């Protein structure tokens, strides 16, 4: 009998790999990312960066950039044509009447503030992010306050175009 457990990924590695694959469906090249929500080692829902149904995607119509001014006074450009992978996954669960209470969310980078509020609101209890997000300090504080466990696998900030 052959022992293949040495080459077998952990559950977290498995779900992070699938999350990357889901991200291949993303339609904004600034942040092609995916999201998987899991409960009891079963996938509950997935999401990727994309426009709402019936609206043009960045890949088709180009980016819809808006300026954002950070608290420190620096300005950044943000594409607002699409919704984030985490938002899309939560919307998919809502459309199908699926509770996310007590589940784990896998994502490419730490969630933004808006995604963090949604994650808290739907009862997700753990977030596993592949990398750090450049503006995640408030998310970290919110998760700590809400009792959500945040695990960042790689101690590296995700880099993307026009960050």
What are these regions (language model features)?
Residues 1-163:
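Zinc-dependent deaminase catalytic domain
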């Amino acid at each position: 009998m052959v022992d293949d457990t040495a080459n077998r990924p952990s559950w977290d590695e498995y779900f992070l790999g699938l999350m990357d694959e889901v991200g291949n469906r993303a339609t904004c090249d600034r942040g092609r990312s995916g999201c998987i929500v899991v409960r009891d080692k079963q996938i509950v829902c997935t999401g990727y960066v994309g426009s709402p149904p019936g609206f043009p995607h960045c890949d088709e119509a180009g980016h819809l950039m808006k300026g954002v001014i950070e608290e420190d006074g620096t300005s950044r450009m943000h594409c607002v044509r699409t919704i984030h992978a985490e938002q899309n996954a939560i919307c998919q669960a809502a459309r199908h009447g699926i509770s996310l209470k007590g589940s784990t969310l896998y994502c490419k980078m730490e969630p933004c503030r808006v995604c963090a509020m949604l994650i808290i609101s739907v009862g997700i209890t753990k977030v596993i992010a592949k990398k750090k997000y450049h503006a995640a300090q408030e998310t970290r504080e919110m998760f700590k306050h809400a009792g959500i466990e945040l695990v960042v696998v790689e101690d590296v900030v995700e880099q993307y175009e026009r960050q």
